[in-house]
């Protein structure tokens, strides 16, 4: 399997079977992977193989990048079905996740009110109230908590 490291906070769009034309938001460093798990099936590879040297994008950097792309797509009549938090690791691990979600919902409504906002997450940070509050704002939570202990079932992570 090839490894993908997303070099920008905003990537795509990609054509998704589930989500349609989907613009991605990567809240992790652009040069590596930061995730609470190390799943064998992850397209970003293993954490140890891609240790980042750069910092995570700031809330302002994400907002500016997202607005630029959304405005351009809107002005050029390019369709968009979904904005998806995904990328180089676990998006809910970003310290400003809730604020970034709030900004994303605002910009989505402004430029593509018919589009959805989705989060691909391994659900490890849902114990944090702020993460739960942020997840309640989005349209589509795609949460997948894989087992991490062999005696509890199939454990890909």
Predicted regions and their residues:
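Short glycine-centered, acidic/aromatic-flanked micro-motifs in structured strand/loop junctions
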Residues: 27, 85-87, 121
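Conserved alpha-helical substructure of the radical SAM core
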Residues: 46-82
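Structural preference for beta-strand elements that scaffold enzyme active sites
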Residues: 22, 82-84, 116-118, 140-142
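Canonical radical SAM enzyme core domain
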Residues: 53-67, 92-137, 145-149
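Short, basic/glycine-rich phosphate-binding loops at helix/coil junctions
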Residues: 43, 80-82, 147-152
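A short acidic, helix-capping loop that chelates divalent metal ions and anchors anionic groups
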Residues: 50-51, 151-157
